[in-house]
C-alpha cells in the first residue's frame, strides 16, 4: 500500500556550523522530488531480504563426515536394528550404529552442499523503488521516531548541514558537530547499546550487537569527514551517489535518521530525477508516481465528476429471498409457528419434573444406614476374612503334597 508523502515543504533550511561565515539570510535548498515519492514498505522489505543474501558465504559439511568407518549392517535375525554397525571388538565403538542421522557419530540428514542458490537477482527498477521509498521515509519524523531514533533536539527533518562538515578531520570535532545539530543523543544511544549478543551467535563471530545511529550522507568524493566519523559507534557514512538500501533501511525497517550535507542534498534531483524529468545518472529512470493522488476513496466516489457518469440505482429490482432453515434457526421457526416457543418451554418444564420425580423415587429406596448396622457389617466382613485364612492353612503339608503327587 502506498503511503502518502509527509515531507511536503518547498524549502529546507541548511543548518550552519560554528566557524561558518555569517550571512544575513538563512540558507535554504529546494526539497527534491525524491522526498515526495510514495513510501512502499512491502517493496522495501522484499528487496532488503533479497539483497542481504548476496553477501553470504557458501558453507557445507564435509562429504566424508559420518562415513569414515567401514560399518556394515548385521542383517536380520540378530534381534537388533538393521542400521550399519562398526566392526571389530575390544572397544566401546565396536557394534555401535553408524552412518545414519539418528546415530551418534553419524552424518546429518541431507548434508548441506555448496551449490545451494545463495544469491538473488532483483529487478533494477524494484531496487531503485526501494531506495527511493527509504529516502522519502527518512524525511517523515513519525517514521524516524518509530524506528527508535532520538531526534527530539533535531531542528527539522530532513536535516541538511552546510558543506563545512566535509572538512572535519578529527573525531572530537565530529562529536562537536553532532552536538550542534542535535544528533548527539542518537549517537549516544547507539554507543550505550553495545552489548554481548544472546544465544549461540556470540560463538560465531557475531559476539557484539549495537543499535544504529545517524547516517551521514556526503556529496564530495574523498571528503575528510569519512575518517572523522567512521570510529563513532552506530554511525554510518556513505556517498550520495552510492546510496544503499542496507544503510538507508537497516533490517528492512523504514525511517533511518539521515544527516545530509548541502552538496549531497542538491544532487538528489540529478541522481533520481523527478516525476516528470528523467534522471541524469540512471538511464531513463523517472520517479514512480502513486496510484492515487488522493487517498480519500469516499471523497472520490462522491465527487461530482464520478457521480455524473455513474449509472443510477436501479429501482424496483427484486432480490431472491434468503431461505433459512426453521428447524435450526429459532427466530425463523417463531415466524412460521409462534406456538413453537411455548411448546419448547413446556417440554423443558416436563423434563425437569421427570428428573425431580426420579430423584425423589430413588431417595426413598436408598435408606441411610445407622452406625450400629455399619459396624455389624464391618465385623461380619472381618470374620469372613479370618475364616478364609484359617481354611487355607494346611497343617499336614507333607501328606497334602503326597496326595497331590508333587515331588520335592
From Swiss-Prot:
Pfam families: Ribos_L4_asso_C, Ribosomal_L4. Belongs to the universal ribosomal protein uL4 family. GO terms for cellular component: ribonucleoprotein complex; ribosome. Residues 58-98 are annotated as: Disordered. It comes from Prunus armeniaca (Apricot). GO terms for molecular function: structural constituent of ribosome. It comes from the Eukaryota. Keywords: Ribonucleoprotein, Ribosomal protein. SUPFAM superfamilies: Ribosomal protein L4. The keyword Ribosomal protein applies. This is Large ribosomal subunit protein uL4. InterPro entries: Ribos_uL4_C_dom, Ribosomal_uL4, Ribosomal_uL4_dom_sf, Ribosomal_uL4_euk/arc_CS, Ribosomal_uL4_euk/arch. GO terms for biological process: translation. Gene3D superfamilies: 3.40.1370.10.
Amino acid at each position: 500500500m502506498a503511503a502518502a508523502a509527509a515531507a511536503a515543504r518547498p524549502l529546507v533550511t541548511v543548518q550552519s556550523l560554528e566557524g561558518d561565515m555569517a550571512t544575513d539570510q538563512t540558507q535554504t535548498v529546494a526539497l527534491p522530488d525524491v522526498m515526495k515519492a510514495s513510501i512502499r514498505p512491502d517493496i522495501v522489505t522484499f528487496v532488503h531480504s533479497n539483497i542481504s543474501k548476496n553477501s553470504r558465504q557458501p558453507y557445507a559439511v564435509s562429504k566424508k563426515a559420518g562415513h569414515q568407518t567401514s560399518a556394515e549392517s548385521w542383517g536380520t535375525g540378530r534381534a537388533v536394528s538393521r542400521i550399519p554397525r562398526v566392526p571389530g571388538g575390544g572397544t566401546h565403538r565396536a557394534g555401535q550404529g553408524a552412518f545414519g542421522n539418528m546415530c551418534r557419530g553419524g552424518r546429518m540428514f541431507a548434508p548441506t552442499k555448496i551449490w545451494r542458490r545463495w544469491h538473488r537477482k532483483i529487478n533494477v527498477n524494484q531496487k531503485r523503488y526501494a531506495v527511493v521509498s527509504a529516502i522519502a521515509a527518512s524525511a517523515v519524523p513519525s517514521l524516524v521516531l518509530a524506528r527508535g531514533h532520538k531526534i527530539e533536539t533535531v531542528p527539522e527533518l530532513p536535516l541538511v548541514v552546510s558543506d563545512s562538515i566535509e572538512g572535519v578531520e578529527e573525531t572530537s570535532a565530529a562529536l562537536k558537530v553532532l552536538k550542534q545539530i542535535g544528533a548527539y543523543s542518537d549517537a549516544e544511544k547507539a554507543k550505550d547499546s553495545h552489548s554481548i549478543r544472546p544465544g549461540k551467535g556470540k560463538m560465531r563471530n557475531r559476539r557484539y550487537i549495537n543499535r544504529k545511529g545517524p547516517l551521514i550522507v556526503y556529496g564530495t568524493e574523498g571528503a575528510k569527514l569519512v575518517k572523522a566519523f567512521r570510529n563513532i559507534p552506530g554511525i554510518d557514512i556513505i556517498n550520495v551517489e552510492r546510496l544503499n538500501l542496507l544503510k538507508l533501511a537497516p533490517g528492512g525497517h523504514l525511517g533511518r535518521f539521515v544527516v545530509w550535507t548541502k552538496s549531497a542534498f542538491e544532487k538528489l534531483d540529478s541522481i533520481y530525477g523527478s516525476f516528470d524529468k528523467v534522471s541524469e545518472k540512471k538511464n531513463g529512470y523517472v520517479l514512480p508516481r502513486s496510484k492515487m493522488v488522493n487517498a480519500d476513496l469516499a471523497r472520490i466516489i462522491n465527487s461530482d465528476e464520478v457521480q455524473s457518469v455513474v449509472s443510477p440505482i436501479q429501482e424496483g429490482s427484486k432480490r431472491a429471498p434468503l431461505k433459512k432453515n426453521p428447524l435450526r434457526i429459532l427466530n425463523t421457526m417463531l415466524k412460521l409457528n409462534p406456538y413453537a416457543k411455548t411448546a419448547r418451554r413446556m417440554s423443558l418444564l416436563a423434563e425437569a419434573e421427570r428428573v425431580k420425580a426420579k430423584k425423589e423415587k430413588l431417595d426413598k429406596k436408598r435408606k441411610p444406614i445407622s452406625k450400629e448396622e455399619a459396624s455389624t457389617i464391618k465385623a461380619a466382613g472381618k470374620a469372613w476374612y479370618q475364616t478364609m485364612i484359617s481354611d487355607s492353612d494346611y497343617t499336614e503339608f507333607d501328606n497334602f503334597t503326597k496326595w497331590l503327587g508333587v515331588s520335592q
